[in-house]
Structure formats: structure tokens, C-alpha cells
Amino acid sequence: MSQPNQIHNALYLAFQRLQWSGLRESVPLTLSENDLADLRGINEKISLSEVTDIYLPLSRLLNLNVGAKQQRGLALNEFLGHVPPKRPYIISIAGSVAVGKSTTARILQALLSHWPEHPKVDLITTDGFLYPLSELKRRGLLQRKGFPESYDMKALVEFISAIKAGEPNVSAPIYSHITYDRIQDEQQWIRQPDILIIEGLNVLQTGQDSPVDTQRPFVSDFVDFSIYVDANESLLKKWYIDRFLQFRTGAFSSENSYFHHYSKLGDEEATATASNIWDTINGPNLTLNILPTRERAHLILQKGPDHMMDQVLLRK
């Protein structure tokens, strides 16, 4: 994460934590400590004060944006003289591995669902659209999992296009972090929510990032509001290693885990393994594919140590 520069100054309004928290106004805190415990990710220490200072103002901003979109829809309906299918407001959340995208998405889902104007809020991750493990092996992409070419982008765009068109029932594949693969014969059904949150590494990509296929639509073409969760790479690497060490004694210990062999590593060897995975896969993916999309986001959440937000950048 670079410090605010000329591009940031030209494109974004910058808010320090105290400034941003003041934009909450009278939005009530609807989550308890028990609720938050269920939403936290591995190795994250997000507190209720973080929800109050950062996420409540953000939920207010999103509620205002959803309301404005709904009003524009009503005006268009009146002009056209008919009522089109219900189309969800789509929010995307991008950022590096280990930055806390999933926790951000779950907290926003919980908060936004308490607004009476849009009580039905669904959440999906793009992980389900990774090619199956067998296909990744066939294509020689196993060591590039998470890179843009490891996703079935055609299926992902068809999914979000159907959502945006107001299709009543749209299915998405489900991914297992235990087996490191899609779950066979299981799907997540999206049935015309008021809001759909889509979380993934590459959801801000455009044709500029795919020179061999610039004309096809991208996920970002269908998104109403985009968020990028940002942090310095040294923090990201540390969080990834810390998470890996926790998985080693947790999820990896299951015999069904694709990474079960890592559970037998000692601390030093596990740390070295995680560091190597970061340096050869996650770090390069961040540098080449994820970080260059940051300035396309409508809002950037910048994290400091302990996953605490220290600045919010809102596009002008």
C-alpha cells in the first residue's frame, strides 16, 4: 500500500478514522459481540468499535446509494410505462489474499440486511468459479490458482449477467477450502435479493487487464459499487503466514484436507513454507493482477496493523 499520492488526491476524498466515524450519524449498531464472533475470519481481531467507526458509516453510504438507484429505477419505469424484473444492487469487494475481504463482506451483509429498504442481502465469493482441481492440473495452472486465468470467467460473467437481468433463480458453484476444489453436486441459489455482495481477488478487472480478450464483458461491468480492501504487502504477508500457522493446527489437521500434509510441519518449516507460497504465488498475483485494479474502486479501505482501518478513500 502506497501513501496517498497525486492520483489518490485527484480521484478520492481521504478520511482519517475519526473523520469517517463522524459520518455514521444516527445509524444504530445492530450487531452484538456474539454476532461479530461468528463473522470474524481466522486471525482477525475486529471489534465492535471497528464496526461502529468504519462499517456503520459505510452501511449508511451504501444505503443512500441503493436508495438513489431504486429511485432512478422508478423514474425509468414511469418513462417506459412498465415494471421490469427486480434487479439487485451489486457490491463487489476486492483485495489481496489474507486482507480480510470475506470478513468485510460478511459484516456488510449483516449490517445492510437490517435496513428496512433492502432486507434481503446475499453474498457469494468468486472461489466457486475457479476451475475444478482436475481442470487446473490439466491446464498446468495449479501453481497459478487465484490468477485471472484460473477462473472460469465465462461462467462467472454469465452468472452475474443473469443476476443483473433479474433472473428469478440463478445458481453458483460452491468451493471448499478443505478439499481445495468445487463441491460436486452442490450449488448456491440466488433468488432476486435486494443486494448481492460478490467478493473475490479479481472483481475489479477490466478489458485493460486482458489484452487478448478486451471485448468481452467483465464482472466490473455489472457492479454498482466497488470496494477495495488495502494493506501494506509486509502486513499481508505476515497475516498470510499467521493464518497458515493457524490452519496447520485447525483445518489442515482434517484428513479430508487437501493440505493435510502441512499439519505435520513444525513451526519453522511451516513458516518457511507459507513464506514461499506468498513469494511465489500470492505476492506476484497481488503485484501483477490485484493491486493495479485498486484505483478503480469507488471506496478503498486502508488497513494498518491488527486489521484496524486507519483511512478510508471515497471516490469523488
From Swiss-Prot:
<dbReference type="GO" id="GO:0015937">
    <property type="term" value="P:coenzyme A biosynthetic process"/>
</dbReference>
<dbReference type="InterPro" id="IPR004566">
    <property type="entry name" value="PanK"/>
</dbReference>
<dbReference type="GO" id="GO:0005524">
    <property type="term" value="F:ATP binding"/>
</dbReference>
<protein>
    <recommendedName>
        <fullName>Pantothenate kinase</fullName>
        <ecNumber>2.7.1.33</ecNumber>
    </recommendedName>
</protein>
<keyword id="KW-0418">Kinase</keyword>
<keyword id="KW-0067">ATP-binding</keyword>
<dbReference type="InterPro" id="IPR006083">
    <property type="entry name" value="PRK/URK"/>
</dbReference>
<keyword id="KW-0173">Coenzyme A biosynthesis</keyword>
<comment type="similarity">
    <text>Belongs to the prokaryotic pantothenate kinase family.</text>
</comment>
<dbReference type="GO" id="GO:0005737">
    <property type="term" value="C:cytoplasm"/>
</dbReference>
<dbReference type="GO" id="GO:0004594">
    <property type="term" value="F:pantothenate kinase activity"/>
</dbReference>
<dbReference type="InterPro" id="IPR027417">
    <property type="entry name" value="P-loop_NTPase"/>
</dbReference>
<comment type="pathway">
    <text>Cofactor biosynthesis; coenzyme A biosynthesis; CoA from (R)-pantothenate: step 1/5.</text>
</comment>
<feature type="binding site">
    <location>
        <begin position="95"/>
        <end position="102"/>
    </location>
    <ligand>
        <name>ATP</name>
    </ligand>
</feature>
<dbReference type="Pfam" id="PF00485">
    <property type="entry name" value="PRK"/>
</dbReference>
<keyword id="KW-0963">Cytoplasm</keyword>
<keyword id="KW-0547">Nucleotide-binding</keyword>
<keyword id="KW-0808">Transferase</keyword>
